[in-house]
Amino acid sequence: MSKEKQAQSKAHKAQQAISSAKSLSTQKSKMSELERATRDGAAIGKKRADIAKKIADKAKQLSSYQAKQFKADEQAVKKVAQEQKRLSDERTKHEAFIKQSLSSMRTTASATMEAEEEYDFFISHASEDKEAFVQDLAAALRDLGAKIFYDAYTLKVGDSLRRKIDQGLANSKFGIVVLSEHFFSKQWPARELDGLTAMEIGGQTRILPIWHKVSYDEVRRFSPSLADKVALNTSLKSVEEIAKELHSLI
């Protein structure tokens, strides 16, 4: 039996006892019992009501938390879907740009009437890296007998820069890409890289990356696909060693 029912039972018995009491002292004693039982019952009832209120409050808090969490989960799912769509759109745009670049290079190459020279290597680089590395690499490759498209050797006064570079890209067996901090920040080398990527997709050339004072993480941030390619590193090999390794491919 619960305490509340026990208190009610005591109060009921006391009430009956008062009705049947024959002496005043017995009535007073039973009245005291009735008051105690009534107080105990009221206290127990209040405690039960307090507990019920606390349970209701906790249930309300839980419901509010679940509603907030559901909303947060919905927003997270929405953000993931938006990010996936953004990445998909970027990939689609980039693929379209590469296809357009490839088409442009083919059109330019077929439209020109002059005899086009073929090259073993096209060197894509930032101008800031010429003095420190690129010009020495170009000289070493040429000394080994390689035919290279290198702006300092190939471009002449009055040449169309875009047309000549498109011709060089289209007529080179390999595309050497000198990846550096300067390369990552320049638009023109990035356009050359897009052209080489288009050629590689079409099976017309191969990209040969050279890391020049950059880390794997820096390359991966710029281009995850380039970071996965086996690369030569100017921090590990000399210019002559790099040139010989490249020349062995032709």
UniProtKB/Swiss-Prot annotation:
Residue ranges for the region (Disordered) are: 1-46
Q: What's any GO biological process attached to this entry?
A: signal transduction
Question: Is NAD among the key words of this record?
Answer: yes
| One cellular component (GO) term of this entry | extracellular region
Task: Please give the superkingdom of this protein's source.
Answer: Bacteria
Q: Which reaction does it catalyse?
A: NAD(+) + H2O = ADP-D-ribose + nicotinamide + H(+); NAD(+) = 2'cADPR + nicotinamide + H(+)
Q: Please indicate if the UniProt record lists DNA damage as a keyword.
A: no
Q: Which InterPro entries match?
A: TIR_dom, Toll_tir_struct_dom_sf
Where does this protein have compositionally biased stretches of type Basic and acidic residues?
30-39
Compartmental location: Secreted; Host cell membrane
Coiled-coil spans in chain: none
Quote one Gene Ontology molecular function term.
Answer: hydrolase activity
EC number(s): the record gives: 3.2.2.-, 3.2.2.6
Identify which residues the record assigns to the active site: 192
* Principal subcellular localization: secreted
Q: Where is the TIR domain?
A: 117-250
Keywords attached to this entry: Host cell membrane, Host membrane, Hydrolase, Lipid-binding, Membrane, NAD, Secreted, Virulence
Q: List the disulfide bonds.
A: none
Q: What happens when the gene is disrupted?
A: Grows as well as wild-type in mouse C57BL/6 dendritic cells, decreased activation of mouse dendritic cells compared to wild-type bacteria. Increased host expression and secretion of TNF-alpha and to a lesser extent IL-12 compared to wild-type bacteria.
Q: Where is the composition biased (Low complexity)?
A: 14-23
Q: How does it assemble?
A: Homodimer. Interacts with host TIRAP. Interacts with host TLR4, abolishes the interaction of host TIRAP with TLR4.
Return the domain comment text from this UniProt entry.
The TIR domain mediates NAD(+) hydrolase (NADase) activity. The N-terminal region is required for localization to the host cell membrane.
Q: Which PANTHER family match?
A: TIR DOMAIN-CONTAINING PROTEIN, TMV RESISTANCE PROTEIN N-LIKE
User: What's the name of the protein?
Assistant: Probable 2' cyclic ADP-D-ribose synthase TcpB
